[in-house]
């Protein structure tokens, strides 16, 4: 972390105890300027919340059998959505509520949605559409307001389809 005011770097390393980063392999970052919070997605360490003002960490991990936790401790991307975070993981996507630390796993009930497992990237366009890059499954678009999920895949018979189903970001 770089403190612009003091012009100093602060290094965070995994240490025993709850007040450190959970893993040093970082895959995703999102800075919430309104709350001065850095959300850190790690590879095998789940999601970390760093409160810049206090320097305190909070960890969010997958708990087997608990659908209100992360679908995986391998976090690939983080995107803000209203007062929540869309978390892309190695085992699907969830809508994370920072207020209570709970996840709502998305797309578990639809045939198309069950294809969304190894998610490489998520982003929103200017119309509020969520775009999902799912390794091996192409690209998905999702509208929260309508619940419409669309899968775009490579089709050798269609020269206008995407070029490959392995989309990383």
Question: Which stretches of residues belong to each language-model region?
Answer:
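Carboxylate-rich, polar loop motifs that coordinate divalent cations or form catalytic acidic clusters
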Residues: 1-169
């Amino acid at each position: 972390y770089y403190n612009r005011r003091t012009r100093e770097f602060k290094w965070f390393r995994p240490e025993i105890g709850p007040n450190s980063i959970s893993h040093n392999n970082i895959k995703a970052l999102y800075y919430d300027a309104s709350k001065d919070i850095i959300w850190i997605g790690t590879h095998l360490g789940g999601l970390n919340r760093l409160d810049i003002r206090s320097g305190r960490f909070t960890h969010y991990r997958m708990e087997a059998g608990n659908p209100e936790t992360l679908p995986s401790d391998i976090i690939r991307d983080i995107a803000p959505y209203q007062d929540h975070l869309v978390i892309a993981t190695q085992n699907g996507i969830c809508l994370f509520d920072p207020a209570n630390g709970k996840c709502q796993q998305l797309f578990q009930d639809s045939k198309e949605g069950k294809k969304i497992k190894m998610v490489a990237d998520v982003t929103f366009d200017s119309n509020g559409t969520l775009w999902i890059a799912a390794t091996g499954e192409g690209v998905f678009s999702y509208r929260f307001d309508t619940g419409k999920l669309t899968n775009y895949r490579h089709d050798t018979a269609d020269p206008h389809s995407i070029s490959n189903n392995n989309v990383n970001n």
